[in-house]
Amino acid sequence: MTLQEEIIRQLGVKASIAPQEEIRKTVDFLKAYLRKHSFLKTYVLGISGGQDSTLAGKLAQMAIAELREETSDQAYQFIAVRLPYGVQADEADAQKALAFIMPDQTLTINIKAAVDGQVEALQAAGVEISDFNKGNIKARQRMISQYAIAGQMAGAVIGTDHAAENITGFFTKFGDGGADILPLFRLNKRQGKALLKVLGADAALYEKVPTADLEDQKPGLTDEVALGVTYQDIDDYLEGKLISKVAQATIEKWWHKGQHKRHLPITIFDDFWK
């Protein structure tokens, strides 16, 4: 088995999908998790205005709405959370995503004071924080807020990790990589886009250029520039297609580099890192 085949197997990616079937499968998955854990009544998800959180949010709201209808339990709620650092440059996109999702509840927590306070505390202790490291603090602070909300509202936190993100390790460890449930896992970027099209999302929500936008000194840095490879190449690779040797080498480099992010903390029994 080639490395490409092994990665595809681990991430569960299909070369082609039926969007309606994947939508139904995901909604049923989200419903089943809450039904199994009767002490949970809510899903919590940060909404950025990008493709991934828009899709995960819409599917979560659909699942919650069906649960309420089927059980007559009004305690089931989907809580969308806006988590800007100061003023978000593409706030209009976030609002467009919320209008599409129509969440039961929307909360806004500005993480700037918490992030800046942490950076200042570290600097006071003599630890200088790089702009890149500060970006990771932002990602982790967003999850702190979401878990605080979930803890108060009998909730589970949804993550937006999908195959095209997982293969490159393009997420912050214990930041956006930390969640309770990953409804998009197995889908690549173009497949997620296909689901949003079927769901009737505004094209602007899935055609916009993906960016994590975590670094102050590199505002709007696109994922593809940061990774050095296009999502088209990543998606093709995940669908078992041939791509250029340069693109393949870049993808596989990120796969190896990000292995630690795909595991729980390492124990003496682990050997994947050796």
UniProtKB/Swiss-Prot annotation:
Binding site for deamido-NAD(+): R140, K173, D180, H260, K261
InterPro entries (alphabetical): NAD/GMP_synthase, NAD_synthase, NH(3)-dep_NAD(+)_synth, Rossmann-like_a/b/a_fold
SUPFAM superfamilies recorded: Adenine nucleotide alpha hydrolases-like (SSF52402)
Top-level taxon of the source organism: Bacteria
CDD domains: NAD_synthase (cd00553)
UniProt keyword annotation of Nucleotide-binding present: yes
Pathway: Cofactor biosynthesis; NAD(+) biosynthesis; NAD(+) from deamido-NAD(+) (ammonia route): step 1/1
MF-aspect GO terms: ATP binding; glutaminase activity; metal ion binding; NAD+ synthase (glutamine-hydrolyzing) activity; NAD+ synthase activity
Gene3D superfamilies in UniProt: HUPs
Residues involved in Mg(2+) binding: D52, E165
Catalytic activity: deamido-NAD(+) + NH4(+) + ATP = AMP + diphosphate + NAD(+) + H(+)
GO cellular-component term (any): cytoplasm
Keywords linked to the UniProt accession: ATP-binding, Ligase, Magnesium, Metal-binding, NAD, Nucleotide-binding
Any Pfam family the entry gives: NAD_synthase
Residues the entry annotates as binding ATP: G46, I47, S48, G49, G50, Q51, D52, S53, T160, K189, T211
Ranges in coiled-coil conformation: none
EC id: 6.3.1.5
GO BP annotations listed: NAD biosynthetic process
Function: Catalyzes the ATP-dependent amidation of deamido-NAD to form NAD. Uses ammonia as a nitrogen source.
Assembly mode: Homodimer.
Family as reported in the entry's similarity comment: Belongs to the NAD synthetase family.
Protein name (Swiss-Prot/TrEMBL): NH(3)-dependent NAD(+) synthetase
